[in-house]
C-alpha cells in the first residue's frame, strides 16, 4: 500500500507511512482531502499537500462529467424501504443511496424507530438491489450497517423485535450492525471517519446512521460566542458523511433535534438544529410529528427532485407500518 502512494510527487516511504497512519490509504482519499487536512500530518507542508492532492486527482481522473455520464451514475442508486408504503411513495421508492437523509422532530416523533427499522430492512436484500441490473443475489455479501449512537437510544432487543415482525432472524441483523457510542463531537466525528477503514477491511457497509446528528455539538458549543466554531465543525462532519455516501454508494441517515421557532405565526413552530450548514448538506429533509395514538406524520420539505409531500405511518410492536 505504501509503495502505491510513493507514486505521488514528494512522497517517499516515510511520508507514505504517515499518510496511511492518518487514514489516507489510497489516491481517492488524498484527492478528496483538503490542504489543511494533509498539513495536520507531521512533516507535510502546504506546498507538498497541494502537489499531492493535484497529482491524486489526476490519477483518479476527477473532473467534469457529461450529463449522460451522471445519468448513468444515477442508475447505480439503490433504495431502502422504511417499512411504510406511504413513506416509500413520498420518496419515489425508498431512501436513496449516494445521499444524506435527515429526519428531524421532537422526542417521541419516531426518529430512532425509523433508524432501527432501516437496520432490519437492510438485511432484506431483495429490496435493496432489485433495481440493479446484472446482480445475482446469491453472490452478494451481506450488507452491513453502522449505527453511531450519541444519545444512548440504540436498543438491540427492539431490533430483534422488529426483525421478528418482518420474518427475518434478529441475530443476523445484529451480527451485521456495527454500533458505536459517541459521548462527544470528537468521538462522533472520529467514528464517522473510521467507517472507511471498515469498508477497506472487507465490510460491505451500505447504511450509516447518526442518531442524533447535533446533540453532542449542541451540548458542547453553547452560546452565540461558540456558534461559528460549532458550525464549522459540523460542516466538516457533514462533508465526511456526504463523501461516504457518494464514494461507496451507501445510504446515510441522520436524526436531528428541533428548537422552538418563536417568530412562526403559522405552520410548524419548530426548526431543525444546525442551520444552513445542515440544510445545504442534507439531500432529503423530513420533519416528523406525532399524531393520534401510534400514528406519526412525515413531511418531506426539501429534496433536489421530489415535491413537498406528507406520509402517515404507524409505530407498532412489529415496527414501522402503514
From Swiss-Prot:
SUPFAM superfamilies in UniProt: P-loop containing nucleoside triphosphate hydrolases (SSF52540), Rad51 N-terminal domain-like (SSF47794)
Presence of the UniProt keyword Ion transport in the record: no
InterPro entries: AAA+_ATPase, DNA_recomb/repair_Rad51_C, DNA_recomb/repair_RadA, DNA_recomb/repair_RecA-like, DNA_repair_Rad51/TF_NusA_a-hlx, Hlx-hairpin-Hlx_DNA-bd_motif, P-loop_NTPase, RecA_ATP-bd
Domain of life, per lineage: Archaea
Residue positions binding ATP: 105-112
Record GO biological process: DNA recombination; DNA repair
This protein's UniProt keywords: ATP-binding, DNA damage, DNA recombination, DNA-binding, Nucleotide-binding
Coiled-coil stretches noted in the UniProt entry, renumbered to this chain: none
Keyword DNA damage: yes
Family annotation (Pfam families): HHH_5, Rad51
GO molecular function: ATP binding; ATP hydrolysis activity; ATP-dependent DNA damage sensor activity; damaged DNA binding
HAMAP family: RadA_arch
PANTHER family membership: MEIOTIC RECOMBINATION PROTEIN DMC1_LIM15 HOMOLOG, RECA/RAD51/RADA DNA STRAND-PAIRING FAMILY MEMBER
Family per similarity comment: Belongs to the eukaryotic RecA-like protein family.
Function summary: Involved in DNA repair and in homologous recombination. Binds and assemble on single-stranded DNA to form a nucleoprotein filament. Hydrolyzes ATP in a ssDNA-dependent manner and promotes DNA strand exchange between homologous DNA molecules.
Protein name, entry field: DNA repair and recombination protein RadA
Top-level taxonomy: Archaea, Methanobacteriati, Methanobacteriota, Methanomada group, Methanococci
Amino acid at each position: 500500500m505504501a509503495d502505491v502512494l510513493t507514486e505521488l510527487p514528494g512522497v517517499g516511504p516515510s511520508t507514505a507511512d504517515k499518510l496511511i497512519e492518518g487514514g489516507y490509504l489510497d489516491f481517492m482519499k488524498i484527492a478528496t482531502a483538503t490542504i489543511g487536512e494533509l498539513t495536520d500530518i507531521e512533516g507535510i507542508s502546504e506546498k507538498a499537500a497541494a502537489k499531492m492532492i493535484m497529482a491524486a486527482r489526476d490519477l483518479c481522473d476527477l473532473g467534469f462529467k457529461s450529463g449522460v455520464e451522471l445519468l448513468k451514475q444515477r442508475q447505480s442508486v439503490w433504495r431502502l424501504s422504511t417499512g411504510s408504503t406511504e413513506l416509500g411513495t413520498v420518496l419515489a421508492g425508498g431512501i436513496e443511496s449516494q445521499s444524506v437523509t435527515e429526519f428531524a422532530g421532537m422526542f417521541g416523533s419516531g426518529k430512532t424507530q425509523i433508524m432501527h427499522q432501516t437496520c432490519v430492512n437492510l438485511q432484506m436484500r431483495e429490496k435493496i438491489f432489485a433495481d440493479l441490473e446484472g446482480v445475482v443475489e446469491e453472490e452478494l455479501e451481506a450488507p452491513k450497517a453502522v449505527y453511531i449512537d450519541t444519545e444512548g437510544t440504540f436498543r438491540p432487543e427492539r431490533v430483534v423485535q422488529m426483525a421478528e415482525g418482518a420474518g427475518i432472524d434478529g441475530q443476523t441483523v445484529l451480527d451485521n450492525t456495527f454500533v458505536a457510542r459517541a459521548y462527544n463531537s470528537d468521538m462522533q466525528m472520529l467514528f464517522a471517519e473510521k467507517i472507511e477503514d471498515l469498508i477497506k477491511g472487507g465490510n460491505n457497509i451500505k447504511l450509516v446512521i447518526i442518531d442524533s446528528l447535533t446533540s453532542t455539538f449542541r451540548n458542547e458549543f453553547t452560546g452565540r460566542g461558540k456558534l461559528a466554531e460549532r458550525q464549522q465543525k459540523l460542516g466538516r462532519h457533514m462533508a465526511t458523511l456526504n463523501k461516504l455516501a457518494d464514494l461507496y454508494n451507501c445510504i446515510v441517515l441522520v436524526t436531528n433535534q428541533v428548537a422552538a421557532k418563536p417568530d412562526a405565526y403559522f405552520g410548524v413552530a419548530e426548526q431543525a438544529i444546525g442551520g444552513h450548514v445542515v440544510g445545504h448538506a442534507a439531500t432529503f429533509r423530513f420533519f416528523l410529528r406525532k399524531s393520534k395514538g401510534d400514528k406519526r406524520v412525515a413531511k418531506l420539505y426539501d429534496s433536489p427532485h421530489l415535491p413537498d409531500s406528507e406520509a402517515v405511518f404507524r409505530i407498532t410492536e412489529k415496527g414501522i407500518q402503514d
